[in-house]
């Protein structure tokens, strides 16, 4: 599972997911991508499940890029614990995703295979996503659905 090797602060505040993604919103490495349409916290387990679903379908052909990294720790207090006595201990890691962010990219496979692989990955994630293609050099969209 993905998690940082070391962090400056062990516990962070929850924060807010306002606005749309201004960075990481274009397909840059691969030919096709999976773009988020809703804001959410994506856990490292969900990222890994989506990655496995994609790589199994493309049968190790082609290449997959994971464009998000879970760098935010989420804390949890033990069950049946009274309120107070400090913040809980870090339980898992999440990636903060805003609408428009490209989550995964894929290359080296046909569009039909990429579309199906990303559809399988979409079902492993807690948000609505859409299939996007890399923009051609002239600036227009090559293919979007």
Swiss-Prot record:
<comment type="similarity">
    <text>Belongs to the universal ribosomal protein uL16 family.</text>
</comment>
<dbReference type="GO" id="GO:0019843">
    <property type="term" value="F:rRNA binding"/>
</dbReference>
<dbReference type="GO" id="GO:0022625">
    <property type="term" value="C:cytosolic large ribosomal subunit"/>
</dbReference>
<feature type="region of interest" description="Disordered">
    <location>
        <begin position="1"/>
        <end position="20"/>
    </location>
</feature>
<keyword id="KW-0694">RNA-binding</keyword>
<keyword id="KW-0689">Ribosomal protein</keyword>
<dbReference type="GO" id="GO:0003735">
    <property type="term" value="F:structural constituent of ribosome"/>
</dbReference>
<dbReference type="InterPro" id="IPR047873">
    <property type="entry name" value="Ribosomal_uL16"/>
</dbReference>
<comment type="subunit">
    <text>Part of the 50S ribosomal subunit.</text>
</comment>
<comment type="function">
    <text>Binds 23S rRNA and is also seen to make contacts with the A and possibly P site tRNAs.</text>
</comment>
<keyword id="KW-0820">tRNA-binding</keyword>
<dbReference type="InterPro" id="IPR016180">
    <property type="entry name" value="Ribosomal_uL16_dom"/>
</dbReference>
<dbReference type="InterPro" id="IPR000114">
    <property type="entry name" value="Ribosomal_uL16_bact-type"/>
</dbReference>
<keyword id="KW-0699">rRNA-binding</keyword>
<keyword id="KW-0687">Ribonucleoprotein</keyword>
<feature type="compositionally biased region" description="Basic residues">
    <location>
        <begin position="1"/>
        <end position="17"/>
    </location>
</feature>
<dbReference type="InterPro" id="IPR020798">
    <property type="entry name" value="Ribosomal_uL16_CS"/>
</dbReference>
<dbReference type="Pfam" id="PF00252">
    <property type="entry name" value="Ribosomal_L16"/>
</dbReference>
<dbReference type="GO" id="GO:0006412">
    <property type="term" value="P:translation"/>
</dbReference>
<dbReference type="InterPro" id="IPR036920">
    <property type="entry name" value="Ribosomal_uL16_sf"/>
</dbReference>
<protein>
    <recommendedName>
        <fullName>Large ribosomal subunit protein uL16</fullName>
    </recommendedName>
</protein>
<dbReference type="GO" id="GO:0000049">
    <property type="term" value="F:tRNA binding"/>
</dbReference>
């Amino acid at each position: 599972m993905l998690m940082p090797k070391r962090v400056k602060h062990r516990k962070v505040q929850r924060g807010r997911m306002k606005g749309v993604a201004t960075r990481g919103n274009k397909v840059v490495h691969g030919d096709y991508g999976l773009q988020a349409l809703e804001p959410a916290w994506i856990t490292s387990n969900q990222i890994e499940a989506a990655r496995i679903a994609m790589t199994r379908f493309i049968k190790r052909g082609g290449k997959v890029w994971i464009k998000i990294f879970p760098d935010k720790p989420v804390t949890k207090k033990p069950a049946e614990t009274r309120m107070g006595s400090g913040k809980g201990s870090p339980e898992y890691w999440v990636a903060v995703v805003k609408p428009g962010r490209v989550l995964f990219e894929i290359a080296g496979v046909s569009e039909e295979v990429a579309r199906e692989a990303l559809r399988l990955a979409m079902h492993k994630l807690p948000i609505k996503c859409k299939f996007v293609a890399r923009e051609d050099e002239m600036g227009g969209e090559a293919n979007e659905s």
